[in-house]
């Protein structure tokens, strides 16, 4: 399995913590405000990020 980059991990952690706002998670992770919406959407299509989010969400169940 591929590993998350530090920025991808920060995105995923912020996405979980903010209740699922991908744009805000991208900005918090360090993506530019200009590209945050696009990068948030792209990150949610990456299996490695989705897998990490799913594993983290199990901790809350």
Language-model regions: role of each:
Residues 1-61:
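N-terminal, charge-rich alpha-helical recognition modules
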């Amino acid at each position: 399995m591929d590993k998350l980059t530090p920025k991808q991990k920060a995105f995923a952690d912020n996405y979980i913590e903010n209740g699922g706002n991908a744009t805000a998670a991208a900005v918090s992770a360090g993506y530019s405000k200009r590209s945050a919406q696009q990068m948030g959407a792209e990150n949610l299509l990456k299996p490695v990020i989705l897998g990490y989010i799913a594993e983290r969400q199990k901790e809350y169940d």
